[in-house]
Swiss-Prot record:
Catalysed conversion reaction: (R)-pantoate + beta-alanine + ATP = (R)-pantothenate + AMP + diphosphate + H(+)
Subcellular locations according to the entry: Cytoplasm
InterPro entries xrefs: Pantoate_ligase, Pantoate_ligase_C, Rossmann-like_a/b/a_fold
Positions that bind (R)-pantoate: Q57, Q153
Name of the gene this protein is made from: panC
Superkingdom, taxonomy of origin: Bacteria
Stated name of the protein: Pantothenate synthetase
Binding site for beta-alanine: Q57
GO molecular function, one term: ATP binding
Pfam families: Pantoate_ligase (PF02569)
Annotated metabolic or biological route of this protein: Cofactor biosynthesis; (R)-pantothenate biosynthesis; (R)-pantothenate from (R)-pantoate and beta-alanine: step 1/1
Species of the source: Corynebacterium glutamicum (strain R)
Length: 279
């Protein structure tokens, strides 16, 4: 496995490679990331993974505790990626990605990036889209792999490549869950044992809605919100039923008769967790 820390080294490493699959990450890797690599490995001659904690997608452009406290464990991440079968790792620092300071020209995500997660984290998806566009330009992948846990991110990136005619196929990969049902996330490392137990109310509420839909029962969305809002140690950010492609909220009156996605975010202590489930 080759590790490149500069753009030139990355471009040199990619010379003469055939089909390329890209797995963009911010590090602090877990089994969910390994599933992305597995999917990429099955469809491409060469698999590239990036590790970069992107300040543009954090509050105050990284001048915040969330950015400073984001887990960084490069040696462990490299070991996981090598075992998973990655060929090239791109692990730049901030100066390498944004030489001379933050960029003047950004990718702006419009309405799809300002609702739900974007409403709570202004500018977040502009930062995501900007760094992903840079990675696409550097790696020139045939396919790129993103976890379905970040459903809004997947929708934003799909619009990015469609609207800017970037020739890359976006491959969402299903959510990986721990045995207790919690969606795998790098942020889970910041939960205490008690906080992790409190966080389980999120997948429980989502799976409850899915069971009601499967049984042909009416969905009580406000009841689901109330359950999360009143759970011990939990603060509700949002829970909505949306169109899977556009993320536009769906108005339902009783039974749901069309494909839909429930997206939700909560805080457990200082840790923000997101999850979603298909209905």
């Amino acid at each position: 496995m080759q590790v490149a820390t500069t753009k030139k080294a990355l471009i040199d490493a990619l010379l003469h490679h055939k089909s390329v699959g890209l797995v963009p990450t911010m590090g602090a890797l877990h089994s969910g990331h390994a599933s992305l690599v597995k999917a990429a490995r099955a469809e491409n001659d060469t698999v590239v993974a990036s590790i970069f904690v992107n300040p543009l997608q954090f509050e105050a452009l990284g001048d915040c505790d969330d950015y400073r406290n984001y887990p960084r464990q490069l040696d462990a991440d490299l070991a996981l990626l090598e075992e998973a079968g990655v060929d090239i790792v791109f692990a730049p620092d901030v100066e390498e990605m944004y030489p001379g300071g933050l960029p003047l020209v950004w990718a702006r995500t419009g309405s799809i990036g300002t609702k739900l997660e974007g409403a709570s984290r202004p500018g977040h998806f502009d930062g995501v889209a900007t760094v992903v566009a840079k990675l696409f330009n550097l790696v020139r992948p045939d396919r790129a792999y993103f976890g379905q846990k970040d459903a809004q991110q997947v929708a934003v990136i799909r619009r990015l490549v469609a609207d800017l005619d970037i020739p890359v196929e976006i491959r969402p990969v299903p959510i990986i869950r721990s045995a207790d049902g919690l969606a795998e996330s790098s942020r889970n490392q910041r939960l205490s044992a008690d906080q992790r137990a409190q966080a389980l109310v999120l997948p429980q509420v989502l799976s409850g809605l899915q069971r009601r839909k499967a049984a042909g029962e009416a969905l009580d969305i406000q009841g689901a919100r109330d359950t999360l809002a009143s759970a011990d140690g939990v603060r509700l950010d949002h829970l909505e039923i949306v169109d899977p492609a556009t993320l536009e909220p769906l108005e339902i009156d009783g039974l749901l008769t069309q494909p839909a996605l429930v997206v939700a975010a909560i805080f457990v202590g200082p840790v923000r967790l997101i999850d979603n489930i298909e209905l």
